[in-house]
Amino acid sequence: MCLARAMQCKKTAEVLSRVQPVLENWRPLVALPEGSRARQRGSGLATPRVTELTHWASTARRFRTLGKLPWAMWLDSAAADAAERFDILVADPYLTLRTRGAVTEIAARGDAARESRRPPFELVREQLGDVAEGAPGLPFSGGAVGYFGYDLGRRLERIPSIAAADIAMPDLAIGLYDWAVVIDHAARRTWLVGNGLDERTFADWPALVARLSAEPPPEPPAFRVRARPVSNLGRDAYAAAFRAVQDHIRRGDCYQVNLTQRFEAEAEGDAWHAYVRLREINPAPFAAYLDLPDGKVVCSSPERFLSLRDGRVETKPIKGTRPRSQDPERDRALAEELRASAKDRAENVMIVDLLRNDLGKCCVPGSVRASKLFDIESFASVHQLVSTVEGRLAPGKHALDLVAACFPGGSITGAPKVAAMKIIEELEPHRRSVYCGSIGYMGFDGNMDTNIAIRTLVQQGGRVYTWAGGGVIADSNVDAEYQESLDKAAAMLAVMAGQ
């Protein structure tokens, strides 16, 4: 054995000696009843195993213990309110799926990759298998984690190919994870949960606990943008695209179109630092950091796309934005101005109606309803107008059926959805890539939570990209809409500028 290997073994043994009492006393949060429907090891279905880890105040520090493990992802409830209190960390999936155009590459650990032209949503559902019990009390016990890029919508609808596809990220990047770290900010507790679908998981359990309990490796290289970000729709080009949208509306082609501009710059270092900074200045309940072979994804989304828990479906579209003010009185006035805005309420209700129709494709008839309309939710940089639509998943339907029925989210397309997507393709110079897609998880237990991938930054191929946009309707004002897009981009651009 070489000296370096011997030293590593000694270090692992030292860490194990500190965490062995935890290993010997692991227990489920709640005991599963005798004979309950649970995953059986050996048949591909196993009762989840749960070990409580020492809780660390810094989830970023815990994530860094994953080091160079492939496909590391952090689903981050950075706002840490009572409703969104859990963080989920995963890495080293036993299988990955990456879709580019009509082809999905499926790569299982240790096997040669294969390709399929079947619908990607079907492929992910197939890998998840039959619904089984999760770990009681935890939102996620293993399953699929990753993103569906906006352009995956081309597999669902006939959209022309006009915009340039210049970011070499997959349309879909999903990992199947046998284990996960789940952090409850409210209870200040942390667990490692695993299923044993991958035979290495339980064999490597002590080493995994040791890794997650050890000091993290050194920080990666600092992130730096080398030049000022450039928009693909400058002020004049944005105005021309805005006028084209309103021409479509006057002709009756659509009611609303989400028009977006993209900012791009050369960058060096690691976008991890951009994410850490972003969650400091703009914490959001549906944030995420994805460290993928193709690039890194940084997301600070305030918007839920689809949640499914115990058959209850929820979506929370955002339409309507005002900037925050440091002056408390002015800040309250901006929030009330948004609440009272007829234009923003009209935008919002258009998307509520669209999503009610989308949910109706997979929900029990009569169960879909708008439970809340025009709530104000305030974040670090903006106030948002948010509504909530709920339903009950129909028998025989799966989380992936729901995603396919609703994708991409109506709040980032417009209405009618397909017409709006065609207009977006006509007017936006570049494809959206990860932006305006969805990031989240789909568990072996049938539950799901996903975001709308807005307030998103992608680092790929020596460059960094971010986007911002908003809904254009008949009585929109070009100056107001352009400014709204800049307000939404403010936090991302500040991070890109190193502020």
Regions found by a protein language model. Give the residues of each.
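Extended alpha-helical targeting/anchoring segments
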Residues: 15-499
